[in-house]
């Protein structure tokens, strides 16, 4: 029996490629330090809903991915594009599907402060005549699509289509800690029909299992990781509980209920949720979120943050997400974010009109508590408490 267990663990880790994620200061913190956040918030509406289910023409022509919604992101990984590889810091985002980075064709202030891809310095780059447009709150990032080899955690992903930005509106992006985005959602929401990175990796038989997994460390600058092609059981305790994907676009699942102190605070008759590494907070409909903010004593400060008394953490209850019959508690020490500047709420209101009814986003606040496996082969998400 022990040998069988050992063999199964070996099989799970076979062809497992890891990308280390580094925890950095968020764009919000950078803007606060430079005295720019108030101007930024005045000119940019912070609307997490705008990332999901774009309506009308935007749904087919544009990847609706306002970068204002990455304001609080802290986890970033490094990839290489081209031959020889040019390095970029990206967000590994399960809430979008395109890969894009700044290019030398972009002269916007945001691009000048970041790594820019130079096609002329890559012997494997192939140009196309296709264009890419990604909507921001204040305009669009426009660019072109090309093909090249992308190095991801030791995988050489050849002939990968990606976006090269030509314009990036908004001087605030000058201070962003990332260069671009690597989307890990389904191909159905990819702009311009571009094949997502993980799909291309799987199609080339570069990994042994059609899945990837994510571990986010709560405290350390390092230790967080995205794993392609396998599962490392040392990152979680107990067994993985599997949840069917309810709609193949985002990593969307059905939630049975959301409770605090045993009472339903939202989702009493079930609701939908998207497991999104590219969203830092727990987002939900504005009405129940407002009730939660009131319950935990959160109030808005001049920086638009919902501030909470740090001393309240020990007395506040867990918020419990029941998913596929299993309870997933998130303690106050996780949903209240602490740093040297004090304590802020990890909840954020948004309204998304969808055919699925009430929608929640389980962002990094949730994923720091639960190791997540994104299983494309079986269209399911695996969750287990982090080790």
From Swiss-Prot:
A Gene Ontology term for the protein's cellular component: extracellular exosome
Keywords per UniProt: Aspartyl protease, Digestion, Disulfide bond, Hydrolase, Phosphoprotein, Protease, Secreted, Signal, Zymogen
Record's subcellular location: Secreted
GO-annotated molecular function: aspartic-type endopeptidase activity
Annotated SUPFAM superfamilies: Acid proteases (SSF50630)
Location of the active site: 93, 276
Enzyme class: hydrolase
Swiss-Prot/TrEMBL GO biological process terms: digestion; proteolysis
Means of activity regulation: Inhibited by pepstatin.
pH dependence as annotated: Optimum pH is about 2.
Disulphide bridges: 106-111, 267-271, 310-343
Sequence positions bearing Phosphoserine: 129
InterPro entries in the record: Aspartic_peptidase_A1 (IPR001461), Aspartic_peptidase_AS (IPR001969), Aspartic_peptidase_N (IPR012848), Pepsin_A (IPR034162), PEPTIDASE_A1 (IPR033121), Peptidase_aspartic_dom_sf (IPR021109)
PROSITE patterns: ASP_PROTEASE, PEPTIDASE_A1
Domain Peptidase A1: 75-384
EC number(s) on file: 3.4.23.1
Reactions catalysed, as given in the entry: Preferential cleavage: hydrophobic, preferably aromatic, residues in P1 and P1' positions. Cleaves 1-Phe-|-Val-2, 4-Gln-|-His-5, 13-Glu-|-Ala-14, 14-Ala-|-Leu-15, 15-Leu-|-Tyr-16, 16-Tyr-|-Leu-17, 23-Gly-|-Phe-24, 24-Phe-|-Phe-25 and 25-Phe-|-Tyr-26 bonds in the B chain of insulin
Prodomain residues: 16-61
Family: Belongs to the peptidase A1 family.
Function, in words: Shows particularly broad specificity; although bonds involving phenylalanine and leucine are preferred, many others are also cleaved to some extent.
Protein's name in the database: Pepsin A
Source organism per UniProt: Callithrix jacchus (White-tufted-ear marmoset)
Gene: PGA
